[in-house]
Amino acid sequence: MPSHKTFRIKKKLAKKMRQNRPIPYWIRMRTDNTIRYNAKRRHWRRTKLGF
């Protein structure tokens, strides 16, 4: 990835960065909750974004 990024790419990277975080702890504490972790977590070295 070049150091000079276009604004479009930068926006996409920012969105993926926001998506790539664990779920908040209070969501796990809710009643009848089945979500234990973020299944769509991405590791920067294992899985690439493809753009």
Swiss-Prot record:
Can you list the GO cellular component terms from the UniProt entry?
ribonucleoprotein complex; ribosome
**GO-annotated molecular function:** structural constituent of ribosome
What keywords are annotated for this sequence in UniProt?
A: Ribonucleoprotein, Ribosomal protein
User: Would you kindly state one Gene Ontology biological process term found in this protein's UniProt entry?
Assistant: translation
Q: Which SUPFAM superfamilies match?
A: Ribosomal protein L39e
**The organism sits in which domain of life?**
Eukaryota
Cystines in this chain? none
**What PANTHER family does its record include?**
LARGE RIBOSOMAL SUBUNIT PROTEIN EL39, RIBOSOMAL PROTEIN L39E
Per the record, the similarity remark reads: Belongs to the eukaryotic ribosomal protein eL39 family.
Q: What name appears for this protein in its UniProt entry? A: Large ribosomal subunit protein eL39z
- Organism for this UniProt entry: Oryza sativa subsp. japonica (Rice)
**Taxonomic classification:** Eukaryota, Viridiplantae, Streptophyta, Embryophyta, Tracheophyta
What gene makes this protein? RPL39A
